[in-house]
């Protein structure tokens, strides 16, 4: 999933991944005619600090939203759901590192 997220930019604001995801889950919020002409190169790779998008992009986009598709977004959404479910399942099986009651003193 990470590779898809940042394939065209370390900052994935309005890049292929984010635009694809929006095309899959809320297409009415995407302006395809704008996205097709909005590609802007990533200027955030290897930066130490995060900067506001108006300091990293000429038009609010990072990467290549022009290649976005609902199909890519649907796959990304499924990956995200699978990852979240796996994390929840792992959390449900997890036990504390030390077997102490929440109400007992810290030291045994």
Please place each PLM-identified region on the residue numbering.
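Extended, histidine- and acidic-residue-enriched regions that form the cofactor-binding/catalytic faces
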Residues: 1-108
